[in-house]
């Protein structure tokens, strides 16, 4: 829904939808798309608070990744601020991770990919228009989501499973919610 809306509105408004540098934009969008797929995939296996806490590691990780990428040190005030913010996130979400283990790093990998995508936006995509970044990101989400739907159509899994059930046509009410969410996502993210 979002891709045609952005493209049609962008063409009508005379926006330049073509990225200046395709490969850096594509690489950046791969990280962000991977983050969202891991995030939503984890919702079927982990408590929502644990998944959200994993994604909300991104701001702290952005600071560290940017420091490594740019080869500059992190000052004590930024370190303390990031630590306090991260602890605040944990206290608000109260993730019941049931004992830390390797599996708990899966939601954190969404935060890591999201952080890399954010740093890559600044490092690789300087000069790109926001609308070119937005529609190309949404398009990549559409492509990977489409592959998933096609795969599960021909190889349906357990109908009761969150991730492996085949395509189910949404009801009119659900379509209404999907459209509403798409419009507000576009307003919130890009317009």
What role is predicted for each listed range?
Residues 4-5, 54-68, 83, 140, ...:
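Alpha-helical transmembrane segments of compact multi-pass small-molecule transporters, enriched
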Residues 10, 41, 58-80:
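C-terminal transmembrane-helix exit sites in multi-pass transporters
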Residues 77-94:
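Hydrophobic transmembrane alpha-helices of multi-pass small-molecule transport proteins
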Residues 38-55, 130-131, 190-191:
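Structural motif at transmembrane-helix junctions in multi-pass transporters
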Residues 1-34, 113-117, 136-153:
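Transmembrane alpha-helices of multi-pass small-molecule transport proteins
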Residues 14-40, 102-110, 159-188:
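Loop-to-transmembrane-helix transition segments
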Residues 1-8, 128-184:
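Hydrophobic alpha-helical transmembrane segments of multi-pass integral membrane proteins
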Residues 1, 98-123:
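Glycine-/small-residue-enriched transmembrane alpha-helix faces in small-molecule transporters
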């Amino acid at each position: 829904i979002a891709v045609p809306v952005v493209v049609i509105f962008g063409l009508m408004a005379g926006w330049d939808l073509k990225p200046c540098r395709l490969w850096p934009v594509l690489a950046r969008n791969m990280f962000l798309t991977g983050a969202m797929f891991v995030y939503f995939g984890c919702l079927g296996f982990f408590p929502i608070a644990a998944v959200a806490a994993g994604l909300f590691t991104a701001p702290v990780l952005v600071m560290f990744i940017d420091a490594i990428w740019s080869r500059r040190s992190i000052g004590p005030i930024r370190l303390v601020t990031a630590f306090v913010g991260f602890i605040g996130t944990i206290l608000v979400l109260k993730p019941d991770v049931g004992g830390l283990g390797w599996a708990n790093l899966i939601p954190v990998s969404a935060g890591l990919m999201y952080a890399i995508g954010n740093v890559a936006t600044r490092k690789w995509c300087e000069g790109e228009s926001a609308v070119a970044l937005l529609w190309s990101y949404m398009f990549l989400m559409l492509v990977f989501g489409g592959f998933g739907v096609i795969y599960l159509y021909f190889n349906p899994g357990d109908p009761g499973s969150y991730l492996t059930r085949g395509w189910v046509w949404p009801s009119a009410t659900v379509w209404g919610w999907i459209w509403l969410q798409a419009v507000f996502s576009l307003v919130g993210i890009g317009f």
